[in-house]
């Protein structure tokens, strides 16, 4: 068993992958078991391509209920209706009250013009490799509008300016990173740019978490 592996190969040879669908109790017990054997090799970020030290717990950045009353939303890297149908329903409710929803996504995430069953005010369709640049372009447009230095090289093109102006208006705003953004090879760049835009526009920044208990297992570890 595990004790024999620990004895013959060392504690560092033991690891555990915990499903983000696990309960907090299950995730905690898995971590406690591994630490009891002298190993800290336990993780629930099963599809991540990049890991950032000290990034903290990834969560929505606002309450679920508040999604229904947002006035401005920017979604990055999410097939919103398929990946997060309940969040999509909340955001759809917000659009019925006049909310503007913008998206930076690939064609896979937006398979058709009405794939999310809600109106999109502005859309940047790009391969995943171009999402960081698209966010940098929005950041450049925000920086130009506010007269501050941009955090990265970008072009304030017409699409970027339209998204920037949307986020600079309104009061209740959110930038939401989807599953494909969390799994992105440059996930840290997407988060840094999103956080900068959020700080400049007053928008909350968060992740549309990928599984039933993604947030809970991060706390439990």
Each language-model region and where it sits:
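Catalytic alpha/large subunits of respiratory electron-transfer oxidoreductases
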Residues: 1-221
